[in-house]
């Protein structure tokens, strides 16, 4: 798993920045104001991937394939969030771009045994997943205190995903499909509603707990997303780590039945 951030701040410099004296490190974005306020976040997402797709198993019999069965590691995904607020009203945009996948070679058991192979047969297999999720929402601040802010939100999310499975058998057994490929794709627009917020704590309000939750439907039977974690507010910006899950359920009769991404995030945020 590779970290997408190419520039690394030395730990000693980061510590020095975090320990700068000040009355309060809480950002202007989370304090009461009628001015325009902006926040941009850049972070990496390191998810495990699960789900089910339908592929032919050497004939007409459908086969449910768990995406996580083929993935022993994933590439990190790029993620960015932009927020704007004036008074209690605001806007929220989040984009996630993922290119995930792995392969196995010489295995006797493809997909954890869900695709049975004849005796003496081995296989090479690969699974590639490309996905982009874009969330757009309007926000309204329902709670605003010196330590806590909570927004309700309503909007839409787009998921554009493709899953490609390839396999090659190394057996000459009659009736065995030597090579195969199956690709399913899905574009889904769904309406969502949710809430997000931050709570600061510590002597100078330098620590905070960020959280986010939404759910909706549309082209998908159900989509939901949730995240929570901890962060540190410095004078130059914020550092935060969360656990995030993005889940889609398209129904049992779809080629792409469901797909989910869950794992840690690590990033920075800047307010102005």
Predicted segments, located by residue:
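Residues on the lipid-exposed face of transmembrane beta-strands in outer-membrane beta-barrel proteins
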Residues: 40-42, 80-86, 136-140, 154-156, ...
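Transmembrane beta-strand segments that form the barrel wall of outer-membrane beta-barrel proteins
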Residues: 206-221, 245
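Predominantly the C-terminal beta-signal and adjacent terminal strand-loop region
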Residues: 226-272
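Extracellular/periplasm-exposed beta-strand and loop segments of Gram-negative cell-envelope proteins
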Residues: 48-75, 97-132, 159-188, 218, ...
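Residues that define the transmembrane beta-barrel architecture of outer-membrane proteins
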Residues: 34-36, 74-78, 130-134, 148, ...
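Short loop/turn motifs that connect adjacent beta-strands in outer-membrane beta-barrel proteins
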Residues: 27-36, 143-149, 201-207, 236
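Cleavable N-terminal export/targeting peptides
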Residues: 1-35
């Amino acid at each position: 798993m590779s970290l997408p951030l190419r520039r690394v701040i030395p730990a000693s410099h980061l510590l020095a920045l975090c320990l700068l004296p000040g009355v309060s490190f809480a950002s202007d974005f989370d304090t009461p104001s009628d001015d325009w306020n902006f926040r941009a976040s850049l972070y990496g997402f390191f998810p495990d991937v699960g789900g089910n797709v339908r592929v032919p198993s050497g004939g007409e019999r459908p086969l449910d394939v768990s995406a996580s069965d083929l993935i022993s590691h994933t590439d990190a995904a790029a993620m960015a969030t932009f927020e704007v607020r004036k008074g209690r009203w605001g806007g929220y945009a989040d984009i996630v771009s993922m290119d995930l996948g792995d392969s196995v070679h010489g295995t006797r058991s493809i997909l954890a045994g869900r695709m049975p192979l004849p005796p003496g047969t081995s296989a090479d297999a690969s699974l590639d997943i490309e996905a982009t999720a874009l969330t757009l929402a309007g926000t309204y601040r329902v709670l605003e205190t010196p330590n806590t802010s909570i927004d309700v939100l309503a909007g839409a999310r787009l998921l554009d995903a493709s899953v490609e499975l390839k396999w090659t058998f190394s057996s000459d057994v009659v009736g065995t499909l030597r090579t195969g490929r199956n690709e399913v794709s899905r574009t889904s627009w769904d309406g969502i509603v949710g809430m997000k917020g931050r709570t600061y704590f510590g002597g100078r309000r330098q620590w905070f707990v960020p959280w986010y939750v939404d759910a909706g439907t549309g082209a998908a039977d159900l989509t939901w997303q949730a995240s929570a974690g901890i962060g540190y507010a410095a004078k130059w910006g914020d550092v935060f780590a969360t656990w995030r899950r993005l889940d889609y359920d398209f129904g049992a009769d779809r080629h792409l039945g469901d797909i989910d991404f869950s794992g840690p995030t690590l990033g920075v945020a800047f307010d102005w």
